[in-house]
Swiss-Prot record:
Function, as annotated: An essential GTPase which binds GTP, GDP and possibly (p)ppGpp with moderate affinity, with high nucleotide exchange rates and a fairly low GTP hydrolysis rate. Plays a role in control of the cell cycle, stress response, ribosome biogenesis and in those bacteria that undergo differentiation, in morphogenesis control.
Annotated compartments: Cytoplasm
Gene symbol of the encoding locus: obg
Keyword Membrane included in the entry's annotation: no
Entry similarity comment: Belongs to the TRAFAC class OBG-HflX-like GTPase superfamily. OBG GTPase family.
Domain Obg per the UniProt entry, residue ranges: 1-158
Cofactor(s) this protein requires: Mg(2+)
Domain OBG-type G: 159-330
Record text on subunit structure and interactions: Monomer.
Name this polypeptide is given: GTPase Obg
Length: 427
């Protein structure tokens, strides 16, 4: 089974908590705060690996989580950072944000990396909060949460040469003769629902990957049938072998078949129609094909294409087509800047986060304060003593929260809520 799309959940590690600690050595009589910072959470990183060729594993495991950072230690010891989670995917995998559809990365080269979820920052230990007026801070920060998101993995098969054509023209039979692949072969539309891959061996040290691209139909570029799925797999091939049933056994006209398929390629992507294309006039073992071949060959050659008579059922002419495809493939690869393409790249994705402005509303007698900045501080500071609460109050005052509360008519003893933190207001 070839699996080319998967949806998975990834979660970066949370940052470790900072701690409250003080120096207690015998010869340090006035030991100050010495709480260490928490470690950073691990990132989630996708890496392209040419040893893989399907996304099948992601159908069975859909949740992935990187390691959390560790808590800080005494004597300003920094907590250990969480290990990054490396997720290997086949070369040719496109990663998208499932919520927005935004393309995060196109991992088309061996070793390409994409950092899609960033680990949370470690919380600061109490030594960071010492001031001239607060020399013994008894509070610290908790670590920040790591990024989390659902992503869609989409594999565009990386075959060198693709077999294209209408359903039931003999592509799967051609592939089975050309390689050791054993595709499902039957006489019905959409016989091949996933690309079948095989290795074609030309001679020692000379080979290429051949893919049977699922059958196209008229309207595929608009998504008819399984059109978009099928056309997606053609994009990465360098050479196309266009299989045409020259016998007309399916009740269609061979030249029209050829023209319609190329029109669909051009509509979907003009670049596809420009790829080198060999035409294999298949089913030459049938009498009708032999009678029609010369006329077909003449019409197609007028359009500038090479035509080869073949019979996938008997193997006749298949080897000649494969050798010619390999020659064209070498020409295409030589034309590319191989050195530049070989360098792996790193993609870094930061999911856009909604920034909420500071707002205050009265709800059932409680003043509810909301906003990205104020909520972040309320979430990160452990409010468990006078020092930490005083720090929090000073922060709210600098942010202008208390001024706005007074404008709204707050009275002593009224309740203020920020996230799950509630306190009574007093001047």
């Amino acid at each position: 089974m070839f699996v080319d799309i998967a949806k998975i959940y990834v979660k970066a590690g949370d940052g470790g908590d900072g701690i409250v600690a003080f120096r207690r050595e015998k010869y340090v009589p006035a030991g100050g705060p010495a709480g260490g910072d928490g470690g950073k959470g691990g990132d989630v990183i996708f890496v392209a690996d040419r040893e893989l060729n399907t996304l099948l594993d992601f159908k069975y495991k859909r949740h992935y989580k990187a390691q959390n950072g560790e808590r800080g230690g005494p004597n300003n010891m920094h907590g250990k950072d969480g290990e990054d989670l490396i997720i290997k995917v086949p070369v040719g995998t496109v990663i998208k944000d499932a919520e927005t559809g935004e393309i995060i990365a196109d991992l088309s080269r061996e070793g390409d990396r994409a950092i899609v979820a960033h680990g949370g920052r470690g919380g600061r230990g109490n030594s960071h909060f010492a001031t001239s007026t607060r020399q013994v801070p008894r509070f610290a920060e908790v670590g920040e949460k790591g990024d989390e998101l659902w992503v869609i993995l989409e594999l565009k098969v990386l075959a060198d040469v693709g077999l294209i054509g209408y359903p039931n023209v003999g592509k799967s039979t051609f592939l089975s003769v050309a390689t050791n692949a054993r595709p499902e072969i039957a006489n019905y539309p959409f016989t091949t629902k996933y690309p079948n891959l095989g290795i074609v061996y030309i001679s020692e040290g000379e080979s290429f990957v051949l893919a049977d691209i699922p059958g196209l139909i008229e309207g595929a570029s608009e998504g008819a049938g399984l059109g978009h799925q099928f056309l997606r797999h053609v994009e990465r091939t360098k050479v196309l072998i266009h299989i045409v049933d020259v016998s007309g056994s399916e009740g269609r006209e061979p030249v029209e078949d050829f023209i319609k398929i190329n029109e669909e390629l051009k509509k979907y992507s003009p670049e596809l129609a420009q790829k080198p294309q060999i035409v294999a006039a298949n089913k030459m073992d049938l009498p009708d094909a032999q009678a029609y071949f010369e006329l077909f060959k003449e019409e197609i050659e007028k359009m500038g294409y090479e035509v080869y008579p073949v019979s996938a059922a008997t193997g006749m002419g298949v080897r000649e087509v494969l050798k010619r495809a390999y020659e064209l493939l070498k020409q295409q690869k030589a034309a590319e800047n191989v050195e530049e393409d070989a360098k792996p790249r790193t993609f870094v994705y930061y999911k856009k986060k909604d920034v909420k402005p500071l707002t205050i509303r009265k709800e059932n007698g409680v003043y509810v304060v909301e906003g990205t900045v104020v909520e972040k501080v309320a979430r990160n500071i452990v409010l468990n003593d006078h020092d930490s609460f005083r720090y929090f109050q000073n922060f709210l005052n600098k942010l202008g929260v208390f001024d706005k509360l007074r404008e709204m008519g707050i009275q002593d003893g009224d309740i203020v809520r920020i996230l799950d933190v509630e306190f009574e207001y007093y001047e």
